[in-house]
Amino acid sequence: MTLLDVAARLAQGRFRLDAKFVAPGDGITALFGPSGSGKSTLLSVLAGLKRCDGYVRLGARALADSGSHLHLAPHRRGIGVVFQDARLFPHLTARANIAYAWKRAPEKARPDICDVARFFDITAQLDRPVGNLSGGEKSRVALARAVAGAPDFLLLDEPFAALDGARRRAFIQVLLAMHETYRLPMMVVTHDIDDAAMLASHLVALNEGRVVAFGPFADVSLQPEFRRLLDDRDAGVAMPARHLRTVRGGQSLWLRADQVLLATERPRAISARNVLQGEVRAVTAEASGGMLIELSTPEGIILSRVTPDAVADLGLVAGCKAWALIKAHPL
């Protein structure tokens, strides 16, 4: 079911936003693009913080429609927003910040604040001023406040931009658990392909203010318009996590071409934990001098980057059988 239907245009100085896409009413959608592509501007349009030409629809409701001069205020849209910097009320406690949204939610839809606090593991912080909280605690309070408002759709703008390593991975798991527990459709803004793959079942790709691709993540990851947004080192595909051993949680893994080795005979007695048989669909020379091999497997398309010598030595041509070897450590 389509929940979010957008055809929005906006001019800001020399920048032009022209975004047309739909997002499903379930799952998590990643809004992906390089820095400066217009992701935060589009998020502001969806939230009602900026006016646009065109329309924004949420289910059967029109949130904005320039043709009928309609522009619903942010608090009437049923959309929750979590910004990079949390934007909590600094003079209030964590509990009061959460209660602010809770009081404005439809009475029948209001969750129990204590239950929400337990879910986000902030019970001990509820009565502390938010100025005394750590960055991670503030992020969890911001998520709790968003959930307490009982939105129909949640927007998150680079929610882990300030996190790295274990804290980043832990926060991704919190978002996945939040989506599963509250059945809350979400759109997450990110420029990191690994984060997008771990979180999202669908993808909207934005470049220079224009949506260049949208749809199921695995499908979009194979589209040339999307591939052009990636650096050479990020070239790869979204592989559903259920197809790979040693992967825990998440929607998919972004499997880079450099992480995949190829063999033309079935490997035996090897340390690689994931071996997938397939057929070579295409062999493409890259400007960097490498060769990109597209392998079709029962689990989906896989890309591997090899040298021209390897292509010649292994006899890699379209139609030949090959085995993809994926080491455990990149997973």
Functional labels for PLM-detected ranges:
Residues R61-D65, R110-Q125, L176-A177:
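Conserved ABC ATPase "signature" region
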Residues L63-G80, R104:
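ABC ATPase NBD coupling module
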Residues P129-L133, E137:
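Conserved ABC ATPase signature
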Residues A148-D152:
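A short, proline-enriched helix->beta-strand linker immediately N-terminal to the Walker B motif
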Residues L154-E158:
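Catalytic Walker B motif of ABC-type/P-loop ATPase nucleotide-binding domains
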Residues L176, E180, T190-R248, A257-D258:
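Internal alpha/beta loop-helix hairpins
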Residues A238, H243-T284, I301, R305-L331:
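Glycine/charge-rich catalytic "coupling/switch" loops of P-loop NTPases
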